[in-house]
Each structure stands twice: as C-alpha cells, then as structure tokens.
Amino acid sequence: MTEETRKSQLSRRQLLGTSAFVAAAGASGLGGALLAGSSETALAAGAAKGGMSPEVKPGELDEYYVFFSSGQCGEVRIVGLPSMRELMRIPVFNRDSATGWGLTNESRKVLTEGLLPQDREFLKDRGDIFLNGDLHHPHPSFTDGTYDGRYLYANDKANTRVCRIRLDVMKCDKIIQLPNQHTVHGLRVQKYPKTGYVFCNGEDRVPIPNDGSHLNDVKQYHAIFTAVDGETMKVAWQVMVDGNLDNVDCDYQGKYAFSTCYNSEEGTTLAEMMSSEQDWIVVFNLKRIEEAVANGDFKEMNGVPVIDGRHGSKYTRYIPVPNSPHGINTAPDGIHVVANGKLSPTVTVFDVRKFDDLFDDKIKPRDAVVAEPELGLGPLHTAYDDKGNAYTTLFIDSQICKWNIEDAKRAFKGEKVDPIRQKLDVHYQPGHNHSSMGQTKEVDGKWLISLNKFSKDRYLNVGPLKPENDQLIDISGDKMVIVHDGPSFAEPHDATIVHRSKINPVSFWSREDPFFADAVAQAKADGLDLMEANEVVRDGNKVRVYMTSSAPAFGLTEFTVQQDDEVTVYVTNIDEIEDLTHGFAIVNYGVNMEVAPQATASVTFKASKPGVWWYYCSWFCHAMHMEMQGRMLVEPKKA
C-alpha cells in the first residue's frame, strides 16, 4: 500500500477492531447514544421553533411526491411529502390482488414479453411469470439535469430485471430481463442531455454462459455493467468488469458513469471478499464505449454487444478506495461525486472534471480524489442540500452526518479545518437517505428522509416482524431537526423526492392508450367497439365475453359458457367521472381486476367448474355497489 493511500484511510483492521463493541450496540439501536460526542437528538418540537412542519391540513396537498422502493414486496409506493402519507402503490414485480396485476392479460404481457428464452422455458410449469421480485432504486427520467416527468425506472435484484413506470398513469408498462448479468443491484439514469441510458450494476459474478459448464472455476466468473435504452427498453451495450459491482451514478455532463465495487479479491466467501485493504470504483467512458460498439470492438453474447472493461481497458478506469465501498452519489453542483466507505469510516470525494485527464493517462487514478473525510462508522449513502453540504448515513453509529464538501477538500490538503457540521441520531441504523430534489441540479435544501432499517421501540409492538422507520428531517436551517417518524412495510431500499411541479398524471385513460391496445384490436377483429359491446363471441372452445361497466351496472347481467372453455372477459369502464374505478371479480374463480375510468381490462381463465358463479364490482363505486353484479353460468360437460 502506498504512503499516499495509507495516510488517507483507516485500515479495515483498525475499523473492525475499534468498532466491535459499537457495532453490537448499533444492532441494539443504541449506537448513536453511545457515541453522543458531537451528536444531537432533535425531536419534532423543533418545528415549533420556527422550522418547517410536516403537517398538511385536510384538503391541502403535499409539495412533493416520494417514490419509495419496497424491496422484497416488489412494488413502488408513492408517498406525499411532508405529510409522509402513503398515496398509492404501483405493482411491478409482484402479484397484486387489488388491481389484478399478474393476472390480467395486460399485466401478464408486461411481465412476460421481456423474459429471456431460458427463463421463459423455466417458468412454463410455474405459471409463466416470476411470483416474486426485489425492487430497489426507483429513479425518474431526466432532461438537462432535472426530472422531466416521463418515466420512473427501478431494478429487481431477485430476478435480474429492470422496469419502467409511466408517470402519466402511474403504471408499469415495460419489464425486461438482462442477459449475461446475474442480479441488478445499483440502478441510476442518465441525467444529461436526457434519459437516455439506464445504468444497471450486475452485482454477482457468474460464468458466461451460466449453463453449468464452469460451476467451480471462479476464473470464468464475471460481473456485468449494463446500459439499457430507456426509450426502447432494450439493452444498448454491456461492459465486463473486475470485482462485484454495488451502486452506480453518473455525471451531469453525459460523459461518465461510475460504480462502487467490492470483492476486488474475486472470492466467493465473506472472508475472501474482505481480505484486501482496498477495493475501487469503476469509471465508464460513455463516448469510448459507444465508439467501441460502432467499431465492432466487442463480443456478442446472447445478442448483446459486450465490451471488455477489465483492468487495462481503454473504456474504464479503476480508482482505489478503502475496502467495500457502498453508495455512490453525484452532487448537484455537477462536479463532485462521493463514494461511501461502509467498512471504512471515510467517504471518498472525486472531481469529475479530472476524469478526462484520467482517461488520457495524464494523471494517476488517485489524483481524481479531492477529499476523504472521516465521518463515523458505517457510511452508506450521501445526499445534498443547496449550500454545499452533504448528509451521509452512518449505519453503525445510527446517525446522519452533515459535512461541508469544500471544507473536506481543504482538510484533505492539510488545512486544520473540521468539515463536520452536525451529527444527528436517527432510529435506527440508516441505509439510504435522500434530500428534496437533491439528485438534480434543482436541489432545494428543504427536506431529508432517512430510511432506517430498524424501528425497534418507535411504534406499538406488532410482533416479531416490525416495520422499517422512515424519518423526515428538516434541513432548511443550520441544524437538522427530525419532525416525523413513518413506519413502512418491508423493505424500502431507496426513495426519490420529486417536486410536484415535475409530474402531471392524468385522471382518465385515453382510449388510444397502447396499454390495452391488444383488447381493442381483438374487439375490432370480432367486429365490436369496446365502448359499446356487451356480447359473447364463441370461437371453438375459446369464448370472448365483452361488457361495459357504468356504475352501478355491468353491460351484461349474465353470460353462459361451457365447462373447460377458455374464457376471456373484457370489461370497459365507460364512466367519465374522475376517481370512479370499477372492479370485476368472479366468486370462487380466483379472478379480480381493476378497471379505471375509460380503461379496458381483460382476464383469461379456464371455466373448469360448472355451476352458477356470480361476478361483482369489487371497487365501491356507487350507493348501489352491492347490486352491481351478474351471473356466469357454466354448463357441465355432456356425458
């Protein structure tokens, strides 16, 4: 290890040796209290002293949307800020009973059309779709460094997928599975000139192809970095790298993306993965990679151009940092990038303006580092305000550390200056944190959310499984002040705070919307108009049932099919009243789906049980809601 590196980091052994007791205390929720020192505990009373309040009175609206991931629940949750009220859930990788996501033909098309061939085959006897997902890192699309209100992208760590959500209707319209890659952990989107690319980190290293021919030959294992075209939702290119990729971000100039990396040792056990004093971040030169694709400097693997970006490649640069960095976050000043140490008490600050010289071999990799302040134990993620300050979560300490970037740079040059402004106890063990508009050039410095992994004693006891704790912090003044605790179900890994002026959802579906275009096309082929049709069409043993719905009645009060028919029911909500969603459920047939105003939804099932089966509107849409029903008559097979 060089003298330059030695003086700019605390070794892994020092960290683990000095923090064993604190780590145990942190796991019990006491870490912040034990390390009080310069820390403070600030409560909601601060709001009464002139700070901001989370109160949103009845009839008033929140100023921000917050898009929360849900981890292993597989959905996106929309929360209002500052009230922290949950407004809506968007099913994505999960099966959702309320809306019929995963059951309706429209949702199943989204869930299946982007599957890889081998997984399509794998799922044939498993219902054709994955029933689980692990949704991390929801991030909206950009134009010129700020949100443009078009899309939200997120990743599925469990099944190596990426989704796109339309922000006009708040529904997922595309899901793709990434070839060659094993898991997607970090995901960020191109900020400039627009999105553009969706950058996806492949965390685990596996053989390519992963067909069982190299099970234990770890030299054949590789990690993959993927760029997805956010407009077409197709893989644009991939880069093979050394080590395991963790989190990713990109610059405000459209030139570079960069990922944290752990397991530079390329081991397969915890001890092997932690044996080195250092890992690295990988910087990707987007222009050079695009030129490589254009010039054919790649190997095609599973239909995708894969570029060699391992050590020595002209397409990447590896910058050493302390062991096992986790989050990487670009500051809204467009200059600085912070990699968070996790196993080191430090964060590493890079100046993106130095990356040009780095790729031209005019400077050494560590010359791109401009600060490396020691903040506390377990730094994971960093957010920003509009005053040049950064806010880093300290997992083991159970704290948020507020520090100043320019002072950290001065200290790195040897000046006697402390960049730390404040440490705030949070409850407990924070992971991600996010500031209002803080991932854009329009950061406003008002609010910070700390996504804490444990709630412990903050809420009524609900049994062994307890909620997470999302704490809202006022950062508009000189001191951070906690103003709200919000419980959340498993398990938010990330969130993005977007000002409401950036998003303009509709209240009605357009009849020209592509989401239900297949239903429109089928009705047209049957000579019908979905806005008027209340008919049954038989095609052999396939039966298509068309009906309208207008509260409080379905257009068909009964329909008859034969046992073992394949039945597709199309329901079109012809109401033109805002917030008048209908449902369609068939008793004892496992069928339920949402039908929003002016939308069509469809479901296909086998009528395997003869008898009388009532269907009803599962959404309370009218005073005569209970009477909005009809009969499905299933004639038994003839002997």
UniProtKB/Swiss-Prot annotation:
Keyword Signal in annotation: yes
Q: List where in the cell it is found.
A: Periplasm
Q: Where does Cu cation Z1 bind?
A: 326, 381
Q: Where does Cu cation A1 bind?
A: 582, 617, 621, 628
Tell me which residues bind Ca(2+) 1: 453, 468
Binding residues annotated for Ca(2+) 2, in chain numbering:
262, 265, 273, 279, 324
Report what the Swiss-Prot or TrEMBL entry states about this protein's PTMs: Predicted to be exported by the Tat system. The position of the signal peptide cleavage has not been experimentally proven.
Q: What keywords appear on the UniProt entry?
A: Calcium, Copper, Metal-binding, Oxidoreductase, Periplasm, Signal
The reaction(s) annotated as catalysed by this protein in its Swiss-Prot or TrEMBL entry are: N2 + 2 Fe(III)-[cytochrome c] + H2O = nitrous oxide + 2 Fe(II)-[cytochrome c] + 2 H(+)
Q: Name one GO biological process term.
A: denitrification pathway
Summarize the subunit comment: Homodimer.
Q: Which HAMAP family match?
A: NosZ (MF_00716)
Q: By what name is this protein known?
A: Nitrous-oxide reductase
Per the UniProt entry, what species is this protein from, by scientific name?
A: Brucella suis biovar 1 (strain 1330)
